[in-house]
């Protein structure tokens, strides 16, 4: 592939995730005004020289995305199975070049599939309907979360959306400690990608983020539930609703799924035994 850098992303280590543009407002179509738009670029994950998937994503925090995607898709089981990564600008987007352990790469080749990405859509390109669901080990019940602490987390979720505050165009995913404090978070134009970035960072942090919950600014799709469960996350909070398939998957894998998370409000779909009313 031609390794010419993108005009918009010449330095892949120092990107903002947005671009200055000129546009027109309804009340004045004669005079353009400055504004910001969120960047959306094709990102290819390349394992040991073989391109596996292309996703549309924000061009930030791509190492965390690669780790999280690799874990949540079952390509690896541990962060240490990735030996190295490089982010490279190519003619049509970005590549994350990932060096996998030999054992994991052999497993990937055995079940390799080609996905052509929409915005963070992980179903696009799946060859058969039976390939959509992944086997997930039922989660243990090792923690409880006091819902009285959820409002604190919700109040600070926007802290991890600097591009979203400028553009109104990103989703967020954050890690909530059992105290309600947000330990960290990520944003992306794709909700699944934002969650993958969070899961990747959680794997890098290790024990410090073992207990707690994931909080996403979007709806809860089946795939987000599956990704969380694949990474051992026991509780998933979503600002919007859950789908029927998301609830079915959460029930089956013992994940506590909570939607419509707003100040003073939460709707629990599955496994309320991990929660304390508040």
Swiss-Prot record:
It comes from the Bacteria. One of its GO terms (molecular function) is sulfur carrier activity. Gene3D superfamilies: 3.10.20.10, Cytidine Deaminase, domain 2 (3.40.140.10). The keyword Plastid does not apply. The keyword Cytoplasm applies. Keywords: Cytoplasm, Molybdenum cofactor biosynthesis. Mo-bis(molybdopterin guanine dinucleotide) binds at residues 260-265. GO terms for cellular component: cytoplasm. It is found in: Cytoplasm. GO terms for biological process: Mo-molybdopterin cofactor biosynthetic process. Pfam families: FdhD-NarQ (PF02634). The active site is at residue 121. Belongs to the FdhD family. Required for formate dehydrogenase (FDH) activity. Acts as a sulfur carrier protein that transfers sulfur from IscS to the molybdenum cofactor prior to its insertion into FDH. This is Sulfur carrier protein FdhD. It comes from Klebsiella pneumoniae subsp. pneumoniae (strain ATCC 700721 / MGH 78578). The lineage of its organism: Bacteria, Pseudomonadati, Pseudomonadota, Gammaproteobacteria, Enterobacterales.
């Amino acid at each position: 592939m031609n390794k010419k850098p993108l005009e918009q992303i010449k330095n892949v280590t120092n990107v903002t995730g947005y671009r200055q543009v000129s546009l027109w407002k309804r009340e004045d179509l004669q005079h353009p005004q400055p504004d910001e738009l969120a960047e959306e670029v094709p990102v290819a994950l390349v394992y040991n020289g073989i391109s596996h998937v292309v996703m549309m994503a924000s061009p930030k925090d791509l190492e965390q995305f690669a780790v999280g995607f690799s874990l949540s898709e079952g390509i690896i089981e541990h962060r240490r199975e990735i030996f190295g990564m490089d982010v490279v600008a190519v003619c049509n987007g970005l590549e994350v070049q990932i060096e996998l352990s030999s054992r994991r790469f052999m497993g990937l080749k055995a079940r390799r599939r080609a996905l052509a990405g929409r915005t963070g859509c992980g179903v696009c390109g799946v060859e058969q309907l039976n390939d959509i669901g992944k086997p997930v080990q039922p989660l243990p019940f090792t923690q409880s979360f006091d819902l009285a602490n959820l409002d604190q987390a919700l109040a600070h979720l926007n802290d991890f959306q600097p591009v979203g505050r400028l553009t109104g165009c990103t989703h967020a995913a954050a890690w909530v400690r059992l105290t309600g404090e947000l330990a960290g978070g990520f944003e992306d134009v794709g909700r699944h990608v934002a969650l993958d970035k969070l899961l990747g960072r959680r794997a890098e942090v290790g024990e410090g983020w073992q207990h707690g919950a994931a909080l996403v600014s979007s709806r809860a799709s089946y795939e987000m539930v599956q990704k969380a469960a694949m990474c051992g996350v026991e509780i998933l909070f979503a600002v919007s609703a859950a789908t029927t398939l998301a609830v079915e998957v959460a029930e089956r894998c013992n994940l506590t799924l909570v939607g419509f998370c707003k100040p003073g409000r939460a709707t629990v779909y599955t496994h309320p035994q991990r929660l304390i009313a508040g």
